[in-house]
């Protein structure tokens, strides 16, 4: 059976950390916690529950903190979790079964991640994340914000579901501040960084700046063919909203149509196009695009 080090970065998570660690005790062979400056009881709770806790001075870099935690791991595989992640009993059982079948031939395991839930508690947003990496393969996180590991080697999909159950709101300006600091320092922006930087500007209704960043992201894709296609489609859609906010209606329409370069038309984009023509009294064109969404 494969051995797994569960690796986490935490700060002031006393309200949720015990819930998370109670889940992972079922399958973790080692728990590594990188604490970035907790002032509550997080560290003592982690230690009481058998985790190895290491101090990591925070420097606005999530990838660096994740990599620090991975560097402390001693088992065959490293698995990352957030403090407000949980697993159901069924998910834990599926994970145990996966451990029995996991061999050294697998470099990376993708697991489903539920990050949004409807009013009935049912998952409304689910996608796969790179969750488990072979320790000796030297995988590294990239990105000061929205850190991720590039897929490589032998990649397999598992079925054990991780649920992200956030209980408190974080600092809504934190990510934006980090990206702006990267700009001031002239740090390199990877395509993924540009996408999420544009989103942060968009969410804060800084449309003119967001438009420029989304354009940089989409131009980088056309030049280098890098980036996840769903991010490109979403960037084109949010670019359109920025253009509307700036009174650039034709540019907004072109942004929506640009999404078709990346993949088959998405229903959401077709609805956006329908709304564009409906708002301008061009009903036949609106009907056409709404029908495409069906």
Question: How would you label these PLM feature ranges?
Answer:
Residues 43-68, 72:
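Conserved donor nucleotide-binding strand/loop of the catalytic core
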Residues 25, 173-176, 180, 211, ...:
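Tetratricopeptide repeat
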Residues 64-70, 76, 87-212, 216, ...:
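Catalytic-site signature of metal-activated, phosphate-bearing donor transferases
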Residues 192, 227-234, 268:
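Start-of-helix register in tetratricopeptide repeats
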Residues 1-23:
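N-proximal low-complexity "stem/linker" segments adjacent to membrane-targeting elements
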Residues 23, 35-47, 58, 82:
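A conserved acidic beta->alpha catalytic loop
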